[in-house]
Amino acid sequence: MQLTSQAFSYGRPIPKKYSCQGVGISPPLSFSDVPREAKSLVLIVEDPDVPPSVREDGLWIHWIVYNLSPVVSNLAEGAQIFAVQGLNTAGEIGYCPPCPPDAKHRYYFYAYALDVVLSDEEGVTKEQLLEAMDGHIIATAELMGTYEKD
């Protein structure tokens, strides 16, 4: 399975329009080579470079989307999501744009193909979602972009 974006390549800067200094909309994403047996897709976006003074665990969850149809091949920028969304670290549902407080940060977009459709309960945490996904992951993909404020 592969996860790519028309807006940035792996390891390259995420354009400003997708950050807190821009419009703050989600970037376009494309899923390919999804296994035929997949029943749903999950997307988790996180920043592992958060200073300990901001978050002790150094991790910020920017977006959680699950129960995406496995036949979805693209999410347009700022797309309305026809799936279930979980809580980001800000305690909100939806995309939280990159806004690093100190330096360049890495933003990992993780895609998972599952052999099940999960509960439609909205607002779960990453930990709750990972627990529900346990034993059901049949493929994964990763995309990483960076962002640093001007």
UniProtKB/Swiss-Prot annotation:
CDD domains: PEBP_bact_arch. SUPFAM superfamilies: PEBP-like (SSF49777). It comes from the Bacteria. Belongs to the UPF0098 family. This is UPF0098 protein CT_736. It comes from Chlamydia trachomatis serovar D (strain ATCC VR-885 / DSM 19411 / UW-3/Cx). The lineage of its organism: Bacteria, Pseudomonadati, Chlamydiota, Chlamydiia, Chlamydiales.
